[in-house]
């Protein structure tokens, strides 16, 4: 398992632990399906920052970063290259 896969697995785990939601696949559109809304984005950012030790300032984030698990993993990897 490479680092991107590990990141994606951790993000999926956050959805289970934090939101009691098991994702059907990594490519499910989190926004279109309503799995992520503005409140959950805030909660998710805080959890990601804590879990991965990164800083994700809201002014640097795009809504597209939250579309899918792979996009979230990519955003975290860009923020902290040593992780991804």
Task: Put a short name on every predicted segment.
Residues 1-23, 74-84:
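Thiotemplate assembly-line natural product biosynthesis machinery
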Residues 9, 39-42:
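Short alpha-helical elements of helix-turn-helix
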Residues 42-65, 84:
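Phosphopantetheinylated carrier protein domains
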């Amino acid at each position: 398992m490479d680092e991107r896969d590990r990141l994606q697995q951790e993000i999926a785990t956050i959805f289970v632990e934090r939101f009691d939601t098991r994702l059907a696949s990594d490519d499910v559109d989190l926004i279109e399906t309503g799995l992520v809304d503005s409140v959950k984005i805030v909660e998710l950012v805080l959890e990601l920052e804590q879990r991965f030790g990164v800083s994700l300032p809201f002014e640097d984030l795009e809504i597209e970063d939250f579309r899918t698990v792979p996009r979230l993993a990519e955003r975290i990897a860009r923020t902290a290259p040593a992780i991804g």
